[in-house]
């Protein structure tokens, strides 16, 4: 029984590691970090081949197959949590506030965020509309700053795949 449990734990560990790396590699590719994704794939495929050979040599036990499946699920979850912590890339926030908060754009610029603003028209009157570009790892900071200055702001976050130009582009890209 001890060797079965030990074998199951090895399979789970290998699969968690493999799938976590796969998830991170996939996200790196989406973010345009092809070199890092390529380097990571070497380690990923090595671990995959090790795990696959172990499971194929031991298909006689349902515990091994269950361990493989459980490791896969945990690996996806763990990989997505790691990516969330890394917060790679940029976010674009569309912020809409009542016009009395016109100073918000200047406050956000002073905090190092890229802001373009213009006047818009809402259902109940004029609104200040802002597009705010920030690194994704500053998203919580941006939202906290907006909330502290204007708690009833309407905010939508998006992830731009590419952008170019603008006075702030050199600062953002490097």
Curated annotation (Swiss-Prot):
Its main location: membrane. Keywords: Cell membrane, Membrane, Transmembrane, Transmembrane helix. InterPro entries: DUF2179, DUF5698, UPF0316. Signal peptide: none annotated. Pfam families: DUF2179 (PF10035), DUF5698 (PF18955). The keyword Membrane applies. The keyword Cell membrane applies. It is found in: Cell membrane. GO terms for cellular component: plasma membrane. It comes from the Bacteria. The chain crosses the membrane at residues 4-24, 35-55, 59-79. It is a multi-pass membrane protein. HAMAP family: UPF0316. Belongs to the UPF0316 family. This is UPF0316 protein DSY1893. The lineage of its organism: Bacteria, Bacillati, Bacillota, Clostridia, Eubacteriales.
């Amino acid at each position: 029984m001890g060797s079965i449990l030990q074998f199951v734990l090895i399979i789970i560990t290998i699969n968690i590691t493999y799938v976590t790396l796969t998830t991170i590699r996939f996200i790196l590719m989406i973010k345009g970090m092809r070199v890092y994704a390529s380097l990571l794939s070497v380690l990923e495929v090595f671990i995959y081949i090790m795990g696959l050979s172990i499971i194929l040599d031991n298909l006689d036990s349902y515990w091994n197959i269950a361990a493989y499946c459980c490791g896969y699920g945990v690996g996806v979850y763990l990989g997505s949590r790691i990516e969330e912590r890394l917060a790679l890339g940029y976010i674009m926030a569309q912020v809409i506030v009542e016009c009395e908060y016109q100073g918000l754009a200047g406050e956000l610029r002073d905090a190092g965020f890229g802001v373009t603003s213009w006047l818009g028209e809402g259902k109940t009157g004029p609104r200040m509309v802002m597009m705010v570009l920030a690194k994704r790892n500053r998203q919580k900071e941006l939202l906290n700053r907006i909330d502290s200055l204007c708690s009833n702001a309407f905010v939508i976050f998006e992830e731009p795949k590419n952008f170019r130009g603008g006075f702030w582009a050199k600062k953002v890209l490097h």
